[in-house]
């Protein structure tokens, strides 16, 4: 069993890639599950609805989890996974089960993504493609969950891809660093992100925009940042940036 996490903006060719890879491996006798996020979204709406994206994501993660618990050789997690934290969620599902995982990043230009989106049967709004493209966080090998990443500039299933998958995608959570993380820096990340959180909630309260749901989402985001970013300055920048996106989406429905 192994987990292959696909990532790339809408229109990068992930689903075509996944289908071709699954077909080739099945011909060799592999038991492959292709978990296609867009197909799951099709059960939730007839036309793209950003308000249901969180529900779609939860359904996608649950489907991947179910497949990882089955007797299979490969699970392909096919979604944009445009934030690093989204790929981390999937890696943790594999790690919990002691299943090796790897990432295929389909690096694609915006013009190509927009053209392919227009050509697909049920295109998503162009502004959504542009927004996700602008927000996309490419995998970085210094993150333990992105250590085994294959970057492709086209969506062909090449010998390089097959070798990457068949090698076992051997990735383990890294050993503890020789230099332990300074506890004071961890505490500073917590304190400073709490300060930013308080500042944001005061601002929202003054404008009458503070809601319980928005507070919950910002709290979840802050906990995610605290658990994954060690540098206080970087943590504050990341939290501010992501928090503003969450606020815009909640207040204006930008999804």
From Swiss-Prot:
Gene3D superfamilies: P-loop containing nucleotide triphosphate hydrolases. ATP binds at residues 8-15. It comes from the Archaea. Its EC number is 2.7.1.164. It holds the Pfam family KTI12. GO terms for molecular function: ATP binding; L-seryl-tRNA(Sec) kinase activity; tRNA binding. It catalyses: L-seryl-tRNA(Sec) + ATP = O-phospho-L-seryl-tRNA(Sec) + ADP. Pathway: Aminoacyl-tRNA biosynthesis; selenocysteinyl-tRNA(Sec) biosynthesis; selenocysteinyl-tRNA(Sec) from L-seryl-tRNA(Sec) (archaeal/eukaryal route): step 1/2. GO terms for biological process: conversion of seryl-tRNAsec to selenocys-tRNAsec. Belongs to the L-seryl-tRNA(Sec) kinase family. NCBIfam families: selen_PSTK. Specifically phosphorylates seryl-tRNA(Sec) to O-phosphoseryl-tRNA(Sec), an activated intermediate for selenocysteine biosynthesis. This is L-seryl-tRNA(Sec) kinase. The lineage of its organism: Archaea, Methanobacteriati, Methanobacteriota, Methanomada group, Methanopyri. The gene is pstK.
């Amino acid at each position: 069993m192994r987990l292959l996490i696909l990532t790339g903006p809408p229109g990068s060719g992930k689903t075509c890639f996944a289908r071709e890879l699954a077909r080739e491996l099945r011909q060799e006798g592999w038991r492959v599950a292709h978990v296609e996020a867009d197909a799951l979204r099709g059960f939730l709406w007839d036309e793209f609805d950003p308000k249901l994206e969180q529900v779609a994501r939860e359904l996608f993660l649950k489907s991947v989890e179910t497949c990882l618990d089955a007797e299979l050789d490969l699970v392909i997690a096919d979604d944009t996974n445009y934030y690093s934290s989204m790929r981390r969620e999937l890696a943790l599902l594999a790690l919990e089960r002691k299943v090796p995982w790897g990432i295929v990043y389909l690096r694609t230009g915006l013009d190509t993504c927009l053209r392919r989106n227009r050509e697909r049967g049920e295109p998503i709004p162009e502004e959504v493609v542009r927004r996700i493209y602008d927000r996309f966080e490419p995998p970085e090998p210094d993150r333990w969950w992105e250590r085994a990443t294959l970057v492709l500039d086209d969506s062909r299933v090449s010998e390089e891809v097959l070798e990457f998958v068949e090698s076992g995608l051997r990735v383990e959570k890294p050993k503890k660093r020789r230099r332990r993380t300074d506890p004071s820096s961890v505490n500073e990340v917590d304190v400073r992100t709490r300060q930013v959180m308080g500042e944001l909630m005061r601002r929202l309260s003054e404008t009458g925009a503070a809601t319980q749901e928005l507070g919950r989402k910002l709290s979840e985001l802050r906990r995610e940042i605290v658990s994954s970013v060690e540098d206080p300055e970087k943590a504050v920048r990341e939290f501010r940036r992501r928090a503003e996106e969450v606020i815009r989406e909640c207040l204006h429905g930008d999804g």
